[in-house]
Amino acid sequence: MNLNTKYHGSIEYEEKDVIYFQKGIPGFEELKKFIIFPVEDNEVFLVFHSIENKDIGIIVTSPFNIEKDYEIQLEEEQITNLKIQDEKDALVLNTVTLDSDIDKITVNLRAPIIINIKEKIGEQIIINSDKYKVKHPLFKEEA
């Protein structure tokens, strides 16, 4: 199949690449089907893109690129909804807010996207803790 995206051109994907979000994601609850593909010439960022709306693509990254000790505790309901039986089956991604000023690029560590890579289902959750910020700087100033 082919997805003609607004910013990333034409992307080839297969049905097995589609990840289903029963609740959609906050702000885009009506969109349920997404694919993930790499940003060209970049090993850190991925594109989390709706296949139902060619204009909706979100830059994401692994939280472990930002915080080596990043950890979250899923609630039983979330584990059940995502059918996670082993933590190796869970992919964790976080949304990135881009800015032309590199020092203003942030990552939302408070609301990770959790994907069961075996079952191809996902959910964006909100962590009820002040441990992580919604606007965590991607690049920290060196002391």
Curated annotation (Swiss-Prot):
A GO BP entry: regulation of translation
Localization per Swiss-Prot or TrEMBL: Cytoplasm
UniProt function note: Acts as an anti-CsrA protein, binds CsrA and prevents it from repressing translation of its target genes, one of which is flagellin. Binds to flagellin and participates in the assembly of the flagellum.
Assigned protein family: Belongs to the FliW family.
Protein name, per record: Flagellar assembly factor FliW
Organism field: Clostridium botulinum (strain Loch Maree / Type A3)
Keywords from the UniProt entry: Bacterial flagellum biogenesis, Chaperone, Cytoplasm, Translation regulation
Subunit and partners: Interacts with translational regulator CsrA and flagellin(s).
Lineage: Bacteria, Bacillati, Bacillota, Clostridia, Eubacteriales
Gene Ontology terms: cellular component: cytoplasm
SUPFAM superfamilies: BH3618-like (SSF141457)
